[in-house]
Amino acid sequence: MKKIVLPFLVIVFALVAFTNVDNCSLSYKGIYAFKLDNEHSAILRFYEDGTVLASTSVNDYLDVFTWFHKENKDMVLTGKYKIKKCSIKFEVTGATGTQKYEGTIRGETLEVKLTDEATKKTATRAYTYFPLGL
């Protein structure tokens, strides 16, 4: 019986470990959005080189893709992100100030605590992924 249980446990553990790794990956071909109200969303975009962009926008996400990119730095907050296991941390800066984010990647959702550096106000948000070309 012990000979059967041990290999079974090893297989189950390996499957759980690999599933969690996949669940902790960012998606780079779209945006993460948090609906602020009926008309506006807070948006994030990540790049494989470690760059992150943050802004607010109307809820028409197809329109967002026309201007929300690295080459348009004047209209967005920019920074670098770091991932450790399922945790993510980044700081973005722009004309409107600096914001710090710290949270967890859960599949296509980012659960983060946001801190505005000027006011020290915090907010907890769950951003949802929307692929490019919805």
Specify the residue positions occupied by each region the protein language model found.
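Sec-dependent N-terminal signal peptides
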Residues: I4-A14
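Lipid interaction determinants
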Residues: F18-L134
